[in-house]
């Protein structure tokens, strides 16, 4: 009592305390960063290595495997995957959540250094690493276009001037420049001219390499002067290389221009980028795992004017894609929802209390509690994101509950004629323990969430802490500010005020009277109610088992990402045509705003596209509906497939896949993997629960297999190294020299001119100069035959791996898909040498599924323990917890009704319901126990009186929580797919629990009371327990 009196009789101190809480919250709000979701990115590091011309199998065995063995020893690596393709290897290291990325980067560098001696000596550079996840969608894409400059020159500007500057911006993890390659001098050899002049490809390579050198020449010096020696030892342009003498034939000079076409071109001609049908260079910017996307994008935008000033006016620099507008729009929608929820909750209070003065009290208490929470969020390092703002929206109903319970009880004493200050003190004393019980037991629900590990635990932690802090501040405000305001602001109702909203008052009285009559009947038919309660428990189990489940609601972020997978033997020219065709189909869709894409590099038969949709207000379809519409049009394109998926704020794993979910096959037997992967993929493609089934295993690339006759080679004076060098010189885009410029270094690239490599007969024109100086055709000592070869070799850990990716058709859930895949694997009878498991997001979903029931049970157990401690009873907590089955049934039925799967967001709703619906029972049980202890009433009389007496606050708190969640259900616009499942779960659970618990709780209370009396050794003390 002294605690309450301290604040009631010291209004100035109480007001200043509330002002201090509010001011701290305002300061915290201004400093909070903005993000789509809590920081849940795994620390990921990508290691890249290249060996131009090497086959995927060579890259896997000679580059990937040594690196994997060294990198696999690093502490904290949760997953290591690699992909080796023509001339390149990429290894993705995913670390545990608690691993510091900078420390991990140092360990990665040390591991690369340790493996260096095991790597091939011909690698042009050491392996490098980046602190970014290549599977993440870029947070921003910049494009460079020009009608004047070539693609190589644009790429040079992008990679030399723009990319390094952008990489230095806080939060930027990686800037990937695509669409072309650096400028280079290309030497296209004419094999017939070489043969006629008796010049080998090695002769050309050696001559060029020796003619372009950069070595120190020293200096001359006398007694008074010093002269630096400078020579014209470097050749920089094609015009300078063309007259280079490479050989003498019968005394005549053979110049490079006589046997080759020399051009100023690019390092790799098999690269193409486009934006809206126009050739472009793309700068794909990805953030660091721990970076804030909004802050990073804002920092990049702030630097754009400076960047534009560094490039010529004839180059157009544009933002082709920006992830931040939809994130900002989504957060604005949540903020509007929060404001609406506060307004609706205050309206509920006004309708019930029918007093403007009384309504002002919760209208002050709610903002103080919510605003004060921002200070704690800032101190905890949280952000303003969809989940934390949804927590505050839901908290609106919770924080007003405490104020309502105190306010309603004080108002009841005022209506009985008690003086305001006395009513405030007496009313607060009566319900102080009730409010404490409700708040502590509600916070207890979230304790298991705080202890939950992995991605779900990290994702839900901000939600749980934010809500718990809001409840804690609300508890403080409801026991300090609320009774003080009641004591000093409220007064006995006047007749004129009692007439306000008389219709609603009469309706409430009628409801209470009707409830009293129905409750009498129920208390005389307790077995029927008990059967209903048991039925709801059984129905809960059945609904939970049968309801479709997924990990996280499918978001509409306004951005689509597409992966092109073409025939494995397709040429680059044909692949570029496919990219253009797909981009035209996409660009013609009315919901599409911008399209960028690129193809080429080490995987000629693949490409990527990034599609920006129009804002939600300018289109009627969701991202998934647009994908479904485009899928039908894209299927008509022969020889290639474009797989589209909506970019999500949460993506797990480092695999670059063409669909949202992955299933990985592992085996130590590569032959078994290659045998079973096509069978499994074809089977999964027939399942109606899956869409866009594709695989990263590509074993049917066209290959020309050359078989050396070693005996003939020995007789002719030719070794294998010379023969392999011939092939690399002719067909490997071999980088044979370096041109040094002030801003960058460029390569001289040699190959047989593409005009002479249009078919297999090109091999017949190749020759080697033997040790006697004679030109020996390749056909003299080698035979060739067409064969199939892999376009890529993939590993997970140290095992061969193949990843099957898939999307979900409309109306299907991830639980449907995972169950269908498990059935298919069983039906196929896959041998034990081939192991299958879900990867990425699908893997996290499986882990979350296994822990959901345990999490719910842990929350219930925690609440039971807290209530048991508070009530010093084993029985009363069970009475209070008997309200939960009806809430569960209501929530699951509502999800089924709205065709929404059970996701992590719905799980949050279930956890919240555990805290919400027990409040009704707490209010009933508290007053019933008080009536038994001090009113000398029988248990049935006590619980009956408690139900009637608490009917109004129960209705008020339930309607406040319901109206607080209702805007989430009705909200549209950006981010609504996250908000609606939470609102649906809470509203459905509240409606059902309100209908049932008003009757089941009294029955359970009496049941446990009789049970306790039956087993008690001291029946006389049963009432005083």
UniProtKB/Swiss-Prot annotation:
InterPro entries assigned: AcrB_DN_DC_subdom, Acrflvin-R, Multidrug-R_MdtC
The transmembrane segments are: 7-29, 336-353, 360-379, 389-411, 431-453, 468-490, 853-875, 895-917, 948-970, 985-1007
Induction pattern: The mdtABC operon is transcriptionally activated by BaeR.
Q: Which residues lie on this side of the membrane: Cytoplasmic?
A: 1-6, 354-359, 412-430, 491-852, 918-947, 1008-1025
| SUPFAM superfamilies named among the record's database cross-references | Multidrug efflux transporter AcrB pore domain, PN1, PN2, PC1 and PC2 subdomains (SSF82693), Multidrug efflux transporter AcrB TolC docking domain, DN and DC subdomains (SSF82714), Multidrug efflux transporter AcrB transmembrane domain (SSF82866)
Statement: the UniProt record of this protein carries the keyword Kinase: no
Is Transmembrane helix included in the keywords of this UniProt record?
yes
Regarding the membrane, this protein is recorded as: Multi-pass membrane protein
UniProt keyword annotations, A-Z: Cell inner membrane, Cell membrane, Membrane, Transmembrane, Transmembrane helix, Transport
The Gene Ontology CC terms held by the record are: plasma membrane
Its quaternary organisation is: Part of a tripartite efflux system composed of MdtA, MdtB and MdtC. MdtC forms a heteromultimer with MdtB.
HAMAP family named among the record's database cross-references: MdtC
Q: Which family does it belong to?
A: Belongs to the resistance-nodulation-cell division (RND) (TC 2.A.6) family. MdtC subfamily.
Job of this protein = The MdtABC tripartite complex confers resistance against novobiocin and deoxycholate.
Name of this protein:
Multidrug resistance protein MdtC
- What is the organism lineage in this UniProt record? Bacteria, Pseudomonadati, Pseudomonadota, Gammaproteobacteria, Enterobacterales
Gene from which the chain derives: mdtC
């Amino acid at each position: 009592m002294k605690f309450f009196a301290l604040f009631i009789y010291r209004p100035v101190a109480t007001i200043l305390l509330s002002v201090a809480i509010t001011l701290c919250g305002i300061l915290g709000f201004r400093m909070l960063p903005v993000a789509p979701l809590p920081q849940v990115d795994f620390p990921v590091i990508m290691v890249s290595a290249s060996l131009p011309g090497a086959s995927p199998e060579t890259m896997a065995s000679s580059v990937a495997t040594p690196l994997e063995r060294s990198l696999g020893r690093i502490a904290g690596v949760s997953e290591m995957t690699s992909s080796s393709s023509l001339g390149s290897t990429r290894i993705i290291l995913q670390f545990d959540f608690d691993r510091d990325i900078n420390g991990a980067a140092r360990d990665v560098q040390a591991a690369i250094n340790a493996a260096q001696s095991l790597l091939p000596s011909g690698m042009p550079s050491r392996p490098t690493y980046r602190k970014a996840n290549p599977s993440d969608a870029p947070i921003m894409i910049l494009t460079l276009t020009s009608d004047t400059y070539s693609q190589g020159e644009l790429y040079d500007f992008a990679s030399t001037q723009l990319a390094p500057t952008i990489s230095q911006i806080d939060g930027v993890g990686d800037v990937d420049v695509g669409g072309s390659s650096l400028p280079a001098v290309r030497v296209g050899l004419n094999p017939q001219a070489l043969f006629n002049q008796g010049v080998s490809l090695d002769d050309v390579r050696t001559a060029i390499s020796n003619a372009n050198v950069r070595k120190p020449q020293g200096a001359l010096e006398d007694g008074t002067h010093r002269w630096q020696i400078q020579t014209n030892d470097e050749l920089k342009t094609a015009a300078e290389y063309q007259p280079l003498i490479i050989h003498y034939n019968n005394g005549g000079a053979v110049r490079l221009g006589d046997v080759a076409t020399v051009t100023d071109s690019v390092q790799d001609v098999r690269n193409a980028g486009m934006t809206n049908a126009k050739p472009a260079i793309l700068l794909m910017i990805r953030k660091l795992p721990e970076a804030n996307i909004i802050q990073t994008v804002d920092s990049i935008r702030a630097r754009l004017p400076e960047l534009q000033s560094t490039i010529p006016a004839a180059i157009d620099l544009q933002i082709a894609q920006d992830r931040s507008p939809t994130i900002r729009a989504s957060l604005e929608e949540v903020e509007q929802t929060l404001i609406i929820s506060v307004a609706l909750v205050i309206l509920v209070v006004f309708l019930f209390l029918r007093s403007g003065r009384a309504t002002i009290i919760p209208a002050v208490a709610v903002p103080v509690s919510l605003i004060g929470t921002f200070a704690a969020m800032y101190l905890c390092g949280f952000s303003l994101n969809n989940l934390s703002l949804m927590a505050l929206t839901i908290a609106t109903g919770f924080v007003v509950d405490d104020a309502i319970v105190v306010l309603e009880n004080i108002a009841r004493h005022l209506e009985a004629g008690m003086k305001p200050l006395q009513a405030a003190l007496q009313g607060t004393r009566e319900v102080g323990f009730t409010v404490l019980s409700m708040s502590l037991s509600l916070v207890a629900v979230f304790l298991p969430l705080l202890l939950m590990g992995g991605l779900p635990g990290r994702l839900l932690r901000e939600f749980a802490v934010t809500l718990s802090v809001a409840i804690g501040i609300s508890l403080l405000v409801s026991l300090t500010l609320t009774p003080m305001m009641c004591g000093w602001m409220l007064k006995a109702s006047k007749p004129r005020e009692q007439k306000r909203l008389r219709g609603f008052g009469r309706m409430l009285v009628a409801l209470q009277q009707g409830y009293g009559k129905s409750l009498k009947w129920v208390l005389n038919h307790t077995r029927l109610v008990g059967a209903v309660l048991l039925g709801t428990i059984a129905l809960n189990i059945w609904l939970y088992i049968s309801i479709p489940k997924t990990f996280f609601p499918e978001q509409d972020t306004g951005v689509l990402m597409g992966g092109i997978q073409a025939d494995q033997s397709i040429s680059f020219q044909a692949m570029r045509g496919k990219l253009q065709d797909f981009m035209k189909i996409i660009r013609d869709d009315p919901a599409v705003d911008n399209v960028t894409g690129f193809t080429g590099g080490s995987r000629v038969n693949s490409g990527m596209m990034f599609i920006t949709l129009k804002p939600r207000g300018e289109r009627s379809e969701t991202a998934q509906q647009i994908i479904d519409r485009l899928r039908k049009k894209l299927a008509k394109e022969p020889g290639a497939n474009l797989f589209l998926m909506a970019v999500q704020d949460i993506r797990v794993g480092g695999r670059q896949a063409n669909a949202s979910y992955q299933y990985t096959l592992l085996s130590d037997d590569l032959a078994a993997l290659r045998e079973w992967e096509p069978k499994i993929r074809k089977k999964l493609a027939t399942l109606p629960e899956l869409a866009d089934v594709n695989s990263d295993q590509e074993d049917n690339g066209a290959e020309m297999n050359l078989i050396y006759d070693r005996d003939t080679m020995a007789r002719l004076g030719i070794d294998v190294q010379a023969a392999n060098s011939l092939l690399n010189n002719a067909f490997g885009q071999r980088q044979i020299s370096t041109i040094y410029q002030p801003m960058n270094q460029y390569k001289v690239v040699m190959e047989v001119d593409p005009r002479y490599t249009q078919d297999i007969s090109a091999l017949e024109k190749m020759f080697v100069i033997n040790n006697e100086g004679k030109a020996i055709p390749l056909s003299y000592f080698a035979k060739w035959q067409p064969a199939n070869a892999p376009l890529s070799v993939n590993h997970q850990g140290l095992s061969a791996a193949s990843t099957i990716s898939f999307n979900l058709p409309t109306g299907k859930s991830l639980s449907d898909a995972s169950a269908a895949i498990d059935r298919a694997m069983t039906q196929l009878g896959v041998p034990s040498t081939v192991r299958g498991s879900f990867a990425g997001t699908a893997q996290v979903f499986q882990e979350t599924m296994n822990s959901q029931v345990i999490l719910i049970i842990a929350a219930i157990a925690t609440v039971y323990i807290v209530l048991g401690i508070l009530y010093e009873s084993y029985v009363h907590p069970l009475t209070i917890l008997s309200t939960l089955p009806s809430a569960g049934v209501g929530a699951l039925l509502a999800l089924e009704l709205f065709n929404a799967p059970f996701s992590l967001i719905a799980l949050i709703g279930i956890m919240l319901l555990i805290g919400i619906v027990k409040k009704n029972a707490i209010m009933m049980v508290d007053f019933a126990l008080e009536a038994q202890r001090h009113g000398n009433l029988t248990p049935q009389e006590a619980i009956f009186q408690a139900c009637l007496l608490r009917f109004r606050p129960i209705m008020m708190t339930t309607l406040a929580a319901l109206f607080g969640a209702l805007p989430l259900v009705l909200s549209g616009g950006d981010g609504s797919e996250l908000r609606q499942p939470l609102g649906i779960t809470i509203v459905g659970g509240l409606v059902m629990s309100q209908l049932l618990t008003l009757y089941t709780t009294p029955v359970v209370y009496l049941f446990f009371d009789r049970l306790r009396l039956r087993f008690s050794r001291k029946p006389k003390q049963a009432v005083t327990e």
